[in-house]
Amino acid sequence: NTTVSTLLAEKLGVPMINFTFRQMAVERNMDFWDFCALANRDDNIDRELDRRQVEMAMAQENCVLGSRLAIWMLKDADFKVYLMASDMERARRIFKREGGSLEERLNQTRERDGHDTERYGRIYGIDNNDTSEADLVIDTEGKTPQMIVDMIIAALPKNC
């Protein structure tokens, strides 16, 4: 998501907003997975992250917001894109970026998804598996970031 968001923002000549759990973990000098476990116990972490992202996006005339919840958080966005990939594909990407074992990354990905789905439902009443809020849903499996950006650009309405 970050790579696609960055490339898309560059292509459109607009800022890219992408404040993430990883960045919050770094701010707090915490391991990412420990921070995720903390977020599962403290709903204020999600609220802070999402508030900060929305504030950053609203401060821009136009931007690309790279966020797991962007299609639900920015109701008035001109165009909402949801990128999806299988658990295995996402685990492969994390493994390539961070190392470890692929099996461990797959288990962590599935565990995180389960916790995220439960948390988003509890905090916001959002079913993050329901992509009906999106204008465009792309299965990223087997596609390069540039291919995905090209698909988004092709689907953008003329007024965006």
What are these regions (language model features)?
Residues M151-N159:
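C-terminal alpha-helix
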